[in-house]
Design a protein with these regions (language model features):
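C-terminal-biased regions
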Residues: 1-93
C-alpha cells in the first residue's frame, strides 16, 4: 500500500471516530480539544490527531466501542501505535 493511500485510510478512520463524539464532549488542556484535533488532522499530523482523540477519556465517559474500533484500525495502519492501550479500553467497555 502506498503511503498516501495509507494516510487517506488513517484520516478516514480518525474522522469516523471524531464524528462519533457527542456534541457536549468536555474539552480540556489535559485531555481532548476539538480545535487541536482539527488542526492536527488538517496538517496531516495523524499520530497527534489520534492521540488528541484518545484524550477524550480524561474528562468524559468512555466513548462507544465503535469509536475505539476506529482508533484500533488507525493504529494498525500506523505500525500499531497505541494498539495495546486502545484494545485494553475497548475490552473494558
Amino acid at each position: 500500500m502506498e503511503r498516501t493511500e495509507r494516510w487517506a485510510l488513517i484520516h478516514a478512520e480518525l474522522m469516523a471516530a471524531f464524528k462519533l463524539l457527542p456534541s457536549n464532549t468536555v474539552e480540556s488542556d489535559n485531555g481532548y480539544r476539538k480545535e487541536d484535533f482539527l488542526d492536527y488532522i488538517n496538517a496531516n499530523e495523524l499520530l497527534l490527531a489520534m492521540e488528541e482523540l484518545d484524550g477524550v477519556i480524561e474528562d468524559n465517559p468512555i466513548p462507544s466501542k465503535e469509536f475505539w474500533l476506529h482508533l484500533i484500525s488507525a493504529s494498525k495502519l500506523m505500525s500499531n501505535k497505541h494498539l495495546a492501550k486502545y484494545e485494553s479500553v475497548l475490552n473494558a467497555t
